């Protein structure tokens, strides 16, 4: 998850040389191409946005909130939500990031708010942050996303709306999240990425949204360790990230 999967990186020996290659690639190829193609004047602000996206993999992205941050913290009034949207579009066109739209599973419709963005190559993402932010849970989530895209699936972020009773006896609407809703033809999988499941409480927390989905498609929790495939009484599958990446047929087991 540290060096990514760009072809040339495999032939470079030594962590320092790999890091230097990725940093140079980011600046001399990706940034240079984007600046030339789109004639960006606010280069420092653009690069700050790239760092924000790199540090928030797996988090919802709201252009309005980001623009307000630039305005309040950086004192920049010329970076609007439309500017942020345009900059993100440039990164998508450069194949640096990819958007996962938000999908209402029970309502069977897309929700046009707070998508998530994942980096096409994690080595490049890590180089952008000078290899200082390597949170395994976020990186693993990005790996799972990339793997399902590599297998040809359309990958969205899922919402499951439920009603729960409060301590005061009132009914309240709660939105639970499914990390990934993966579709390919008639096939669909619901995936949760959980780097660590230290106890039963955490396991039930990860399964909660999956348990609220009322269809028969496969529901899988992927954990950040080697693990033989398990299946609970509700049919929810648990498997390790190594097995998930190595044996593609396991998701159909």
Enumerate the predicted regions with their spans.
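Interdomain motor-coupling "hinge/lid" segment immediately C-terminal to the ATP-binding subdomain
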Residues: 1-60
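Short coil/turn segments at secondary-structure boundaries
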Residues: 13, 41, 63-66, 100-102
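Hydrophobic (often cysteine-bearing) scaffold residues that line and stabilize catalytic clefts
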Residues: 18, 22, 42, 80, ...
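Short, locally clustered residues in the helix-turn-helix/winged-helix DNA-binding domain
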Residues: 51-55, 71, 149
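DNA-recognition alpha helix
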Residues: 64-75
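A cross-kingdom feature that marks ATP-driven nucleic-acid transaction machinery
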Residues: 83-90, 95-253
């Amino acid at each position: 998850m540290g060096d990514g999967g760009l072809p040339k990186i495999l032939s470079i020996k030594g962590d320092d040389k790999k890091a230097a290659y990725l940093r140079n690639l980011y600046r001399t190829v990706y940034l240079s191409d984007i600046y030339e193609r789109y004639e960006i004047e606010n280069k420092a602000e653009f690069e700050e946005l790239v760092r924000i996206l790199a540090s928030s993999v797996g988090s919802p992205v709201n252009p309005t909130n980001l623009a307000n941050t630039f305005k309040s913290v950086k004192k920049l009034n010329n970076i609007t939500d439309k500017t942020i949207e345009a900059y993100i579009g440039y990164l998508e066109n450069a194949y640096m990031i990819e958007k996962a739209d938000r999908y209402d599973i029970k309502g069977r419709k897309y929700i046009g708010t707070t998508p998530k963005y994942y980096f096409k190559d994690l080595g490049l993402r890590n180089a952008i942050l000078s290899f200082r932010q390597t949170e395994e849970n976020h990186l693993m989530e990005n790996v799972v996303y990339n793997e399902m895209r590599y297998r040809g699936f359309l990958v969205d972020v899922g919402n499951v709306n439920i009603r729960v009773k409060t301590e005061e006896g009132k009914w309240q609407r709660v939105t639970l999240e499914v990390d990934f809703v993966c579709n390919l033809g008639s096939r669909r999988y619901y995936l949760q990425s959980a780097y660590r499941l230290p106890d039963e409480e955490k396991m039930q927390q990860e399964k909660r949204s999956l348990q609220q989905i009322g269809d028969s498609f496969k529901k899988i929790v992927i954990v950040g360790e080697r693990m033989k495939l398990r299946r609970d009484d509700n049919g929810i599958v648990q498997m390790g990230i190594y097995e998930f990446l190595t044996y593609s047929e396991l998701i159909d087991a």
